[in-house]
Amino acid sequence: MIKVAIVGASGYTGVELIRILHSHPEVAVTCVTSEQSAGRPVSSVFPSLRGRCDIVLENLEPVGIAEKVDIVFTALPHKAAMEVVPTFMKMGKDVIDLSADYRIHDADTYGKWYEPHLNPELLPEAVYGIPELRRAEIAEASLIANPGCYPTSVILGLAPLLKGKVIDPRSIIVDAASGTSGAGRGAKVDNLYCEVNEGFRAYGVGGVHRHIPEIEQELSLLAGNPLNITFTPHLVPMDRGILSTIYSQPTGSVKAADLIALYQAFYDGEPFVRVLPEGVLPSTAHVRGSNFCDIGITVDQRTGRVIVISAIDNLVKGASGQAVQNMNLMCGLPETLGLDLLPVFP
């Protein structure tokens, strides 16, 4: 059995890792950590785990964690991850980091959007963990930068168009909507029930959302040239899910049927990407609790613009499920192991 630690297990991505790995036939979760809830069974923090996972949360130094396990998942906020990841790496442990700390290749860019990087020497070692595009690199990696939730939905939604040079890379506009779990479990006034319920609002407007450099980095690699996008996130009064509506201008005349065929060929054999038939569009309700990314494509006949809509569960394909998918690849296991999760509907 592969022994794993979940560092930062008292957040939403942490408990989602526990939920998924509990059914993984090759994994034993042997260490879960939390500063605030140390000494308590994890099931007392998350009653949904009662009777199935009662492991006690610990507050350990990185060395103590590394001594117990083979692989470490760091489900920590940015900066907190880069304070502990170097120790795990020095002790020979594979690390899958769910924070933003190792996603951006350039330390100066990271510093502009976040803060000065504490260990920029590790950035070249980190592999951006989007399996559909980096499968071979992930299999050889010892440090995975697990992608963000919005970036996952946008990158998977645009990859075939950019690789196929079907669209003008300068024309990309993204409107993306997320459930409230994307903001984490910490208490914030903006996430209170009365602030969110019966409302729908934009935030991070005007090119200031921190996922923008991550998205642009990966889309630029796909396009073969640097590009900028217009990205506007929105908050939806639901627990989980992301729906991204992506607009772009094609380089020539295109038909929806041809674009769907392009996507089907690009994602042929991918276990977690579902390209929908013409006239069928994704819904977050149909991916909830699963590792799927559903993609629908159409063309605005009046303006000629291509419209791609992608739907994911922000806590699964947008975080913990993709992390387990990466772990499977790193360990030489079947990629879908532990991830055969049917969406929860209704």
Swiss-Prot record:
Coarse class of the protein's main subcellular location: cytoplasm
Per the record, the pathway is: Amino-acid biosynthesis; L-arginine biosynthesis; N(2)-acetyl-L-ornithine from L-glutamate: step 3/4
Q: Where is the active site?
A: 149
Any Gene Ontology CC annotation: cytoplasm
Pfam families for this protein? Semialdhyde_dh (PF01118), Semialdhyde_dhC_1 (PF22698)
* UniProt-annotated location(s): Cytoplasm
Which EC number(s) are documented for this chain? 1.2.1.38
Which GO BP terms sit in this record? L-arginine biosynthetic process
Keyword terms, alphabetized: Amino-acid biosynthesis, Arginine biosynthesis, Cytoplasm, NADP, Oxidoreductase
InterPro entries from the entry? AGPR_AS (IPR023013), AGPR_type-1 (IPR000706), NAD(P)-bd_dom_sf (IPR036291), NAGSA_dehydrogenase (IPR050085), Semialdehyde_DH_NAD-bd (IPR000534)
MF GO annotations: N-acetyl-gamma-glutamyl-phosphate reductase activity; NAD binding; NADP+ binding
> Which transformation does this protein catalyse, written as a reaction?
N-acetyl-L-glutamate 5-semialdehyde + phosphate + NADP(+) = N-acetyl-L-glutamyl 5-phosphate + NADPH + H(+)
Top enzyme class, one word, equals oxidoreductase
The UniProt entry's coiled-coil ranges are none
PROSITE patterns noted in UniProt = ARGC (PS01224)
Give the UniProt family note: Belongs to the NAGSA dehydrogenase family. Type 1 subfamily.
The role this protein plays is: Catalyzes the NADPH-dependent reduction of N-acetyl-5-glutamyl phosphate to yield N-acetyl-L-glutamate 5-semialdehyde.
Protein name, per record: N-acetyl-gamma-glutamyl-phosphate reductase
Identify the species of origin.
Answer: Citrifermentans bemidjiense (strain ATCC BAA-1014 / DSM 16622 / JCM 12645 / Bem) (Geobacter bemidjiensis)
- The gene for this chain is argC
